[in-house]
Amino acid sequence: MEIRNERQLNPVADEVSAITAVVRPILYGILYSLKAEVVEEAGGREGVKLRMLPRLRRPGSGDTGICFEYAVHDAVRRGEPDVSERVYDALSHCRVRGNSVGSILFGAEKAGSQQLIDTAEVLLTEDSVLLSGSRGRPVKLKRHLTSAAAAFRKKGAESGLPQSISGLWRADLFLGHSDTDSWVGTTVKINPLGLKGYPGLRIGVVPASQGSSDGIRKDDTKNLVICPMPYDGSFVETFYMAWEVVTAFLEADAQVPKEVSLPRPAARTVARYLADRREFPVVDVIDALGALSQPELLQTQTLSAGLVLSGGKSDIVQTTSVLAPQPTFANSSI
């Protein structure tokens, strides 16, 4: 039996802090969606000031999806409980074992993708394995990154990728456990109708539909474990509030929007955070907002417990996991 002990490190954030936390990856996503030639004329991504974003950015239909992907990645890295718990359970469905949930951006189709690929190479080790779900030994992930990037540029033709992971170039993230260095290819779609399965992809991350079930499930037709991000009063709702702040701020030429464009007091507070920093580079603003964001919430410890059977004890896992509150006793002699 698996026992997972989660200890809360920090109190749950207020609305302003929660929105601020998600604004950061949205800004990152917009910055990296800028075309390379536009960025070069502005002095490189490190030099793009926040006030320049409205003029450099060309809004597109895929912007929300790109930023949702970055927000999911960031939430996993921050230990956002609603997201990390879902990812942990989805990985368990894929039989990926470990204690430390992690996320690595890949996104070969994004502008600035070479930097993302280079970053992924740094984060991975020679022992990092990709669990594709097919029979046979897991493949070493790092050695296939370059082939995956090349496959995107050729739309999958003559990629050099093994057949079992021939669709890896379509991955947006690698989700897994950093302590066991085990990863799975993951596709992220803000529109669930756009979710498709390919060899090498194991998990599909989508927003849960408002008011409907958000349970993790296996889709046999797509050969994907579907991992809906929670909506009502949770991650997806916060994402859309943060997206509203950023788009309204950019439409107002990097100033605080009119109240009719952003009527919620919490949202206007975050917009003021941005307006106060409009003369600074976007990368520095993202870093500065970190101090105002929701900090990491949970510390997770996982262990296996033996089962007492009639006739003896066994370490064979019969039950996947048990979830229950851990009591604390303040000022108690117990």
Predicted regions and their residues:
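Non-catalytic C-terminal interaction segments of nucleic acid-processing enzymes
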Residues: 251-334
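Polar/charged alpha-helical tracts
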Residues: 14-21, 25-32, 37-40, 89, ...
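Acidic-basic catalytic patches of nuclease active cores, encompassing PD-(D/E)XK
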Residues: 48-157
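Alpha-helix boundary/N-cap detector
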Residues: 22, 63, 67, 71, ...
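Nuclease-adjacent, charged terminal/linker segments that flank catalytic cores
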Residues: 1-97, 310-314, 318-334
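Active-site beta-strand-loop-beta-strand hairpin of nuclease catalytic cores
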Residues: 165-167, 174-186
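Catalytic cores of nucleic-acid endonucleases
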Residues: 136-142, 150-153, 159-168, 188-266
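Hydrophobic transmembrane signal anchors and adjacent membrane-proximal interface regions, especially
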Residues: 3, 36, 50, 85-89, ...
